[in-house]
Amino acid sequence: MMRWVMAVVLALGCRALAASPCTIQTNWLCAGTPQATPCYVIDSGRTGPVVLVVGGMHGDEAGWAAAGQIAAWQVRRGKLVVLPQANRPGVFQHTRLQPAESNAALRDLNRNFPTKTNAAPRGALAAAIWAQTKAVKPDWLLDLHEGYPKLATRTNGVGSSLIVMTPMLTLPVVSNLLDAANTIVTNTAQRFRLLRQPIAGSLARAAGDRLGCHAVIAETSRDNPNISERTRQHRLIVHRLLRKLEMDANGPDVLTRRQPGVIRVALYDDSGGHTRVSVEDKLDRAGDLETHRVDGGMIERGVLEQFDVFFAPGGSGSGQARELGEKGREVVRKFVQGGGGYVGICAGAYLASRSTKRPYLGILNAGIADVDRGRDVVTVELTEAGRKLLGCTERELKINYHNGPVWGPGQKSAPACEVLGVFRTEVFPTNRTTRVTMSGTPALITGTYGQGRIICSSPHPESTAGLDAIFLHMVRWAAPK
């Protein structure tokens, strides 16, 4: 999810939806300070409830990503108010606490709101958030968090729970939210449960005690490594509430909308894929790229229609192919065939290739000549076309390599690939012998499939120091023109 230019993106989105009855007002809290963070008021123009959604209170939790996606939603009555990155500096630095707060007692933002013994919020950021909360007068407040579940070895975990004000425990809508959260939970240890009373000093507790608001803290489980699934649980909870309040105007899998000058990138985040946070950060900081994590189920349900580029990361090409399944693979093929871009690195490059042994996509006209060569730093010589496309003046690059494909010929009847770079060193497998020569084979290639463009790299430029610009050129080149 794009942290760095979200305000610009959403403002553009408001103008792009001029035909919609919704208007979007952006309120900057702590404007002009390092803690500055935007709050969006999405107004249907019709009388109805006010729902406030907060994310990023703790910067290392993925609630901010879900809230940022919800900020792209519309409502058919009432107002949806979204504060995606309450602790914005913490979100940028992936830290739970406020990194710039010098007073250690105030570093946990979600302990700084009014309590029964202290009517005033503590610290400038908490004061601004509290003032905004009072100004919008929410009927419901949902604060999106993550925790670890309560297990035999972890007795105080709050992960996989909805924490509500005690009087709300018997409300039918609360049990309905619980059902929504559990619709995609397969691990019984991660099933959501109800807990009472948000902790004193939290925004939810303050809103419940002092504003009479229906306040809920939604805690997904950080034991679930799939970030896209955790953010979807948050979206399902919020969407179910909007539906019960007759406010919903779109489904829970709306993540983004088209914006002028912004390339929307879907990051594969499921079995077989290793999308690193550092890679996500590099894309986000580019300024013209908006990223969201998607899993196999979301791809099957058509979420790629909202994107310009699909990024398949390292990991296991076979694992990604299996997780996508026959239907998901066909969805990706049609996405590229219809003009979508495809960027594949290592495992993602395998996934795009042709193979008679594995259920790869087959959208790249290159066969797999060898696999599992090992790990090393390799020398790649760029072709003239490669230097031009990647914006690189150097002829040779040192790139991290980890079992990427060694490509061989494709099908003569299909569009030929263009080689951007070739291996100039060998990586010899330690557990077997091979007669396949790696040196001289393609390391980076491009191709077309229908109206879409494909660019794949066997080694890892995205995780090699100094090659960020090359990686970003790959993504931008794949985007539809």
Ranges and model annotations:
Residues 6-39:
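Short glycine- and acidic-rich boundary segments immediately preceding or forming the N-terminal edge
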Residues 38-43, 204-209, 435, 439-448:
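Short, surface-exposed beta-strand/loop micro-motifs that present aromatic residues
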Residues 197-255:
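Active-site-adjacent mobile loop/cap segments within catalytic or ligand-binding domains
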Residues 236-258, 333, 357-362, 367-370, ...:
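Extracellular ligand-binding/catalytic regions of CAZymes and related secreted enzymes
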Residues 318-396:
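A glycine-rich, often tryptophan-bearing local segment used as a flexible ligand/cofactor-contacting loop or short
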Residues 380-463:
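Catalytic beta-strand/loop cores that center a nucleophilic Ser/Cys/Thr
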